[in-house]
């Protein structure tokens, strides 16, 4: 084990030097294989493709190898751990300096004659053919690793890899006899006598018979027959199998470019686009393999070969490839190192075809960064990490530099491959549909197939002649510009290759070939012919120079002066030299022939590229026409969507402006709110949204009828959701009157529950007609009062009936005896039913209308009330009088509510309710939660009057409640605090005040207030003075939650209304806070308009925006505010931020601040919370729009 670890560390160090070759079945570092050649010699011509069905060829190959194997034992050859290995001649060998290149060629050149060492130097342009190393007697030559090498018949070019075999310089390690590995690989080169002037090379992989038992031999035979039956363009073609007394031999196709691992070691990392192209081809081949019930189980870069035209071929399947019916000892066996193996195989668990999906991920990582996962660990450590379910492959196996090489789509693709559980891992068909493959294969898939078919095959070692067509359909790319640039690059490469060929002269220079002659006459005749040749090709000025050159390069030989033995030796030397020259001339002619063949290839590639561009233009024309139709359709759909959006906005506006008369209308509004998918965070702080029990309907809690829901608050709406994930509310309650909110508690046998009772008053539309505010009938009904009338829904219509149209009434009045109806005319009310409470109707003449046409003046009750008021004014102070008025009103509200409940039980079907109250009960387990919710609900309900088209109580009762303590200026029209109109006389008060509620600062527009201040002031003076006082007392406990004395708040309000300056030094901070909230609630206009509120909610709920983008959008939104509104919002948020900073930061502090000021300023809670947290960034110094 220590030796293996030491060897692996050595392999890893060599990998860092870019000498790493991914291992084969064993998973170890690979070295060049022992290469044995079986050759026969002949003059090579242009080879052609071999028919796949040529059985004679297979027999010749097998017979040739059998002859070799009979004479040579496989034991004498060193074993290697790779199935197939060969060294490829790179451009670096042929780009050496002239001297080194000449030395390299001399090293590779075989001896041409016995005394070749004494021969003259040859030209540097001469190249050599592999036929020089072939035996002339057609004998089989065995070439060991250090004995002989062969030269490529083609000079390597930048466009393709050659099949040259160079002498290996690496060591060969002994490998243990492991099943699934080959002892050696031999190359069979067949020539004329087999293939009719064609040279083809076939690799044969040999396995020693002593290493495998009889069971394994049968398995190998059966599986080879299965592999031989596979016919696919992405799988290596297996030709035959040799089985004799020495062992097994497998004959397959030969590919001169080698494996992807060899290419990585030669050229470096692959580009992602090229990896995607190869991955697509491999997945298509694996899809075919899996459809045949076969699992590869040994997929890695060393087992993927590259053919001409960029086509990859899968080879070297692991033993036990069948999905079933395999012996367990083989099926669950481990092949080599675990770096490429899936967790289920390493755990020896049952596996399926998804083990190849794991190997695909390892292969992609290997092609891009040069190593599989966990290659920096030892084998056992890597096995543990792969099996460990908590360990992730990405990005643990990559450093920071390597992670930058992987795109986002590729990372997603690899995550699907590296799922530890096979059920979660993507199959081959799932990976084929991944967008990462379509990114790089859309535009190149169709072109690559056409170009590969159009290229002529100069030397084809691919026996699979018919290339199967792509299983995928034709892909089209709309990126015409990238196609155009790619075509230009390819054409420039082809033309540059053509220029290089043109620069190489195809004519043979005879001056390089020096032949010796026998006598002087022949030499002179040769000189004469040679001079004529030069005169025809050169200028006349160079004639003498050429003669001198020729004279210097030749020598006169006089054989008569020598002895006979010397003449014989001299003639032998001349013959040897002339033979050498003849060989050089032959090689030069072969090189010229090869250059012409390459030129022919370039012409054919130009032709195929022209056809490809033509097809691209046709496709582009079709796509352009289709794009135009799609563009028209898209524009039409955009216009339709625009119109629908405008209709939707108008409907939303109509729904907002519509008078809501029933609770189902409130649900419609909730639907509009949640149609924009507003989250809970933008609705309200999460601390104000909780699970609770509620009931709707009765004002009393009924056991067993409660519902559990998730409640949250939005403006004046209380939404109930089934759970936190629900997107549509199940119930909606509208809060429109603070008098309808009360608290109570109930006690049962188990525990005590705290109840909040909320009443929503819904009125008839005719009673809220704003056009008849001055002369309409005023209703002083309580929240639960019911008005019973005839079939006429409007009480005003019943009061305007003619006096002569009197009907008989059968009424049983069990209601309040103090109900007063006053009218100016002799109007009779018509009713059929049991009237329990009739709303009082005020008429100036002070007469009472009774049933049965009897009209009497009511003097005694009024006189008694006036006397009581006078006595009370004399005995008690004004403050006590106000308190008693409040108590009386509360008692009347309770009586009216009781009367309304009894009236609801006694109503007939013919009676119409002009107003009704919907009750909602919220139940809490403890008083603290109840108090928190009660405070929030109390702050949400507005104190100001609603407009006529909003859900609201009638205007008069609310004004009475708000201004009943204000004395009327009309002394002749005094009324009791409990009577209609209150102490203030609302009608006369409105006339004298001109319709303005407050004459001072409360209830006045901010723009009007700022006109009274200096131009440089940001806030009104009284407001800035109030905020400075509160900032000094911000540490006061409960400054936002607790409310000060209502009497003190009212006194400070009256001082402000009179224009007096208030000294807040000795004032209660809680009362000053209440005054501040009162001022903000009474503002006639909202600080943030409705459309800006909607925009802010959409910005904050948009998940695509980051923090900076949201701040930028909010700044743009706030810039639309006027200067007074912007300053008020800025200073109020600064004060709220100061409260949060001075307190111990927690969710409850910011929740209290939000619930205090967000409803008061009428700003969405989510926006308020966001502005507090980002105050410094949201309020920079910039010019605001006026």
From Swiss-Prot:
State the UniProt keywords alphabetically.
ATP-binding, Coiled coil, GTPase activation, Nucleotide-binding
Q: Record's Gene Ontology CC terms? A: cytoplasm
Task: Tell me the disulfide pairings in this chain.
Answer: none
Q: Give the highest taxon in the source lineage.
A: Eukaryota
* Start-end of Polar residues biased regions: 453-468, 766-784, 969-978
The record's GO molecular-function terms, alphabetically, read:
ATP binding; GTPase activator activity; protein serine/threonine kinase activity
- Pfam families the record matches: Pkinase, RhoGAP
| Record's compositionally biased regions (Acidic residues) | 1-12
> What SMART domains does the annotation carry?
RhoGAP (SM00324)
Task: List site positions: Arginine finger.
Answer: 1041
Rho-GAP domain segment(s): 1004-1186
* Bias type Low complexity, positions: 34-48, 99-110, 530-545, 785-836, 897-911
Entry binding sites for ATP: 179-187, 205
Disordered, as annotated region: 1-55, 99-122, 447-468, 530-551, 766-911, 959-988
Q: Write down the PROSITE patterns for this protein, in alphabetical order.
A: PROTEIN_KINASE_DOM, RHOGAP
**Domain (Protein kinase): residue spans on this chain:** 173-437
Regions of biased composition (Basic and acidic residues) lie at: 847-896
GO BP: any one term: intracellular signal transduction
Q: What is known of its domains?
A: The protein kinase domain is predicted to be catalytically inactive as it lacks an expected active site aspartate residue.
Query: Which PANTHER family does this UniProt record tie to the protein?
Result: SERINE_THREONINE-PROTEIN KINASE DDB_G0283821-RELATED (PTHR48012:SF26), STERILE20-LIKE KINASE, ISOFORM B-RELATED (PTHR48012)
Instruction: Give the family, as the similarity comment puts it.
Output: Belongs to the protein kinase superfamily. STE Ser/Thr protein kinase family.
Protein name per UniProt = Probable inactive serine/threonine-protein kinase DDB_G0293184
Print the organism lineage. Eukaryota, Amoebozoa, Evosea, Eumycetozoa, Dictyostelia
């Amino acid at each position: 084990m220590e030796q293996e670890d030491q060897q692996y560390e050595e392999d890893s160090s060599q990998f860092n030097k870019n000498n790493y070759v991914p291992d084969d079945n064993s998973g170890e570092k690979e070295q060049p294989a022992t290469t044995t050649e079986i050759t026969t010699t002949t003059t090579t011509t242009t080879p052609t493709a071999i028919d796949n069905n040529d059985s004679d060829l297979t027999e010749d190959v097998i017979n040739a190898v059998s002859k070799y194997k009979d004479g040579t034992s496989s034991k004498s050859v060193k074993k290697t751990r790779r199935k197939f290995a060969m060294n490829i001649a790179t451009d670096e060998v042929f780009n050496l300096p002239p001297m080194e290149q000449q030395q390299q060629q001399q090293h590779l050149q075989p001896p041409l004659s016995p005394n070749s060492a004494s021969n003259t130097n040859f030209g540097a342009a001469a190249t050599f053919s592999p036929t020089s190393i072939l035996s002339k007697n057609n004998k089989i030559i065995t070439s060991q690793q250090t004995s002989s090498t062969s030269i490529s018949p083609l000079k390597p070019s930048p466009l393709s890899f050659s099949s040259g075999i160079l002498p290996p310089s690496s060591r060969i390690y002994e490998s243990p006899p492991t099943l699934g590995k080959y002892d050696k690989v031999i190359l069979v080169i067949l020539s004329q006598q087999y293939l009719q002037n064609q040279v083809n090379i076939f690799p044969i992989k040999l396995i020693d018979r002593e290493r495998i038992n009889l069971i394994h031999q049968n398995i190998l035979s059966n599986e080879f027959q299965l592999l031989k039956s596979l016919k696919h363009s992405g799988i290596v073609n297996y030709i035959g199998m040799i089985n004799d007394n020495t062992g097994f031999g497998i004959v397959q196709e030969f590919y001169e470019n080698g494996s992807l691992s060899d290419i990585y070691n030669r050229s470096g990392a692959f580009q992602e686009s090229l990896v995607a192209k190869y991955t697509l081809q491999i997945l298509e081949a694996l899809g075919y393999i899996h459809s045949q019930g076969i699992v590869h189980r040994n997929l890695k870069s060393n087992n993927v070969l590259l053919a001409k035209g960029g086509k990859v071929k899968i080879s070297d399947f692991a033993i036990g490839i069948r999905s079933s019916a395999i012996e367990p000892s083989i099926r669950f066996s481990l092949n080599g190192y675990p770096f490429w193996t899936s967790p289920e195989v390493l755990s020896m668990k049952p596996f399926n075809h998804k083990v190849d999906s794991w190997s695909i991920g390892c292969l992609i990582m290997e092609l891009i960064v040069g190593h599989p996962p966990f290659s920096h660990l030892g084998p056992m450590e890597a096995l543990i990490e792969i099996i460990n379910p908590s360990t992730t492959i990405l990005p643990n196996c990559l450093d920071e530099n390597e992670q930058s090489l992987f795109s986002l789509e590729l990372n997603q693709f690899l995550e699907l491959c590296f799922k530890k559980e096979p059920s979660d891992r993507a199959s081959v068909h799932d990976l084929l549909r991944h967008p990462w493959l379509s990114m790089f294969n859309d535009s190149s898939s169709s072109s690559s197939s056409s170009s590969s078919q159009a290229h002529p095959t100069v030397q084809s070692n691919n026996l699979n002649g018919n290339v199967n067509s792509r299983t995928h359909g034709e892909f089209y790319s709309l990126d015409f510009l990238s196609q155009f640039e790619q075509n230009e690059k390819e054409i420039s490469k082809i033309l540059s290759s053509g220029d290089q060929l043109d620069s190489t002269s195809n004519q043979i220079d005879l001056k390089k070939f020096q032949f010796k002659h026998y006598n002087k006459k022949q030499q002179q005749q040769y000189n004469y012919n040679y001079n004529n040749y030069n005169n025809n090709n050169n200028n006349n000025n160079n004639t003498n120079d050429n003669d001198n050159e020729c004279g210097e390069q030749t020598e006169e030989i006089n054989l008569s002066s020598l002895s006979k033995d010397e003449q014989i030796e001299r003639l032998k030397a001349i013959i040897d030299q002339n033979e050498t020259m003849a060989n050089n001339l032959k090689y030069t002619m072969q090189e010229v022939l090869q250059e012409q063949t390459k030129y022919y290839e370039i012409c054919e590639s130009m032709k195929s590229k022209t056809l490809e561009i033509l097809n691209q233009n046709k496709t582009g024309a079709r796509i352009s026409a289709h794009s135009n139709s799609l563009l028209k359709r898209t524009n039409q759909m955009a216009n339709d969507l625009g119109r629908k959006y405008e209709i939707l906005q108008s409907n939303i506006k109509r729904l907002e402006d519509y008078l809501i008369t029933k609770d189902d209308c409130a649900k419609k509004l909730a639907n509009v709110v949640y149609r924009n998918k507003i989250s809970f965070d933008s609705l309200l702080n999460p601390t104000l949204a909780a699970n609770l029990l509620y009931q709707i309907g009765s004002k009393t809690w009924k056991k067993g009828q409660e519902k559990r829901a998730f409640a949250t608050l939005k403006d004046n709406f209380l939404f109930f959701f089934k759970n936190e994930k629900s997107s549509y509310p199940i119930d909606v309650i509208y809060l429109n009157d603070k008098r309808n909110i009360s608290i109570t508690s109930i006690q049962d046998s188990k525990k005590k529950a705290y109840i909040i009772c909320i009443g929503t008053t819904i009125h008839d539309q005719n009673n809220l007609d704003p056009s008849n505010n001055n002369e309409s009938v005023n209703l002083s009904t309580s929240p639960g009062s019911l008005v019973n009338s005839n079939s006429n829904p409007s009480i005003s219509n019943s009061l305007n009936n003619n006096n002569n149209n009197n009907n008989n009434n059968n009424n049983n009045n069990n209601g309040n005896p103090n109900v007063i109806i006053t009218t100016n005319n002799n109007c009779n009310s018509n009713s059929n039913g049991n009237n329990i409470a009739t709303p009082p109707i005020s008429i100036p003449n002070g007469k009472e209308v009774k049933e049965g046409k009897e009209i009497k003046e009511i003097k005694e009750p009024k006189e008694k009330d006036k006397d009581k008021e006078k006595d009370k004014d004399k005995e008690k102070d004004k403050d006590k009088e106000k308190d008693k008025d409040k108590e009386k009103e509360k008692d009347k509200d309770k009586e009216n509510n009781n009367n309304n409940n009894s009236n609801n039980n006694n109503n007939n079907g013919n009676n119409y309710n002009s107003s009704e109250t919907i009750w909602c009960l919220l139940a809490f387990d403890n008083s603290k939660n109840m108090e928190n919710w009660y405070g929030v609900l109390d702050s949400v309900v507005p104190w100001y009057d609603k407009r006529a088209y909003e859900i609201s109580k009638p205007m008069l009762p609310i004004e009475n409640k708000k201004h009943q303590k204000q004395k009327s200026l009309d002394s002749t029209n005094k009324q009791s605090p409990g009577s209609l109109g209150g102490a203030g006389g609302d009608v006369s008060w409105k006339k004298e005040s001109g319709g303005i509620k407050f004459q001072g600062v409360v209830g006045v527009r901010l723009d009007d207030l700022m006109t009274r201040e200096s131009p440089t002031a940001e806030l009104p003076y009284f407001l800035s003075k109030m905020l400075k006082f509160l900032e000094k007392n911000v540490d006061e406990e409960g400054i936002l939650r607790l409310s000060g004395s209502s009497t003190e708040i009212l006194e400070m309000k009256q001082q402000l209304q009179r224009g007096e300056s208030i000294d807040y030094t000795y004032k209660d901070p809680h009362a000053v806070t209440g005054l501040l909230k009162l001022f903000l609630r009474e503002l006639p206009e909202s600080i943030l308009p409705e459309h800006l509120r909607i925009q802010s909610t959409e910005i904050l709920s948009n998940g695509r925006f980051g923090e900076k983008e949201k701040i930028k959008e909010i700044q743009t939104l706030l810039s639309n505010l006027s200067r007074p509104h912007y300053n008020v919002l800025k200073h109020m948020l600064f004060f709220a931020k100061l409260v949060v900073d001075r307190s111990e930061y927690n969710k409850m502090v910011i929740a209290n601040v939000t619930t205090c000021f967000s409803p008061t300023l009428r700003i969405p809670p989510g926006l308020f919370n966001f502005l507090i947290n980002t105050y410094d960034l949201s309020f920079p110094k910039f010019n605001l729009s006026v």
